[in-house]
Amino acid sequence: REAINTFLLADADIVPHPVDEEGIVLDDAPCDYYYVTPGHQVPTGVAMSQVRRGQLLEHAARHDAVIVEDDYDSESNFTLNPLPALKASDRSGRVIYVSSLSKALSPGLRLGFMVADPDLIDEARALRRLIYRHPPTNIQYQMAHFLAQGHYETHLRRYHFDSAQRWERLNNALHRY
C-alpha cells in the first residue's frame, strides 16, 4: 500500500494487472513503469514464473518501460524454491531492484537498499538527504559488516527453515480443524 500511495503522490495513473498462477498477466497497452513483486506477490503469494519474467522483460524493452522490482517479503515464500531476482536477468538496465532487510531481521530496523543505474542511485541519495537528513550510519556500517561476513545468508537459512516449519504447522492445523 505504501508504494501505491507514493505513486499517487506523483499523480501516476495506476493500472492494476491481473495475477494468475504464473504471476502478472500482461496486455499490449503501453506502460511507462511496472511495479512488481515477482518473488512473492502480495497478497496472493504467487511467485512469477521464469517464462513470465522473460515476457515482462521483453514487454518492457518493446514499450521502453522501466520495471521496479520490489523484493518485499520474498523470504516468506516457503513452498517454492525461489528464482533469482528479475534484476539478475536484466540486460538492458530497465529493472530497478529494491528490497528491505527488515522482514527477515527486525521490523524496527527500517533498512533497505536499491540496485540500479549509478546515476539513479545518486539521484535517490540526493532525494533521501532532503527527506531524511541523517540516516543512522552506525547501523548501515554494522549491517555492511554483517553482510560481508556471510552472517545474513546463515541467518536467512535458519529464518527460512524455522518459518517454514511454523507455516507447515499452521497449515496442518487449519486443515485439521
Can you say where each PLM-predicted feature lies in the sequence?
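Residues that form or flank phosphate/diphosphate-binding pockets in enzymes
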Residues: 2, 51, 107
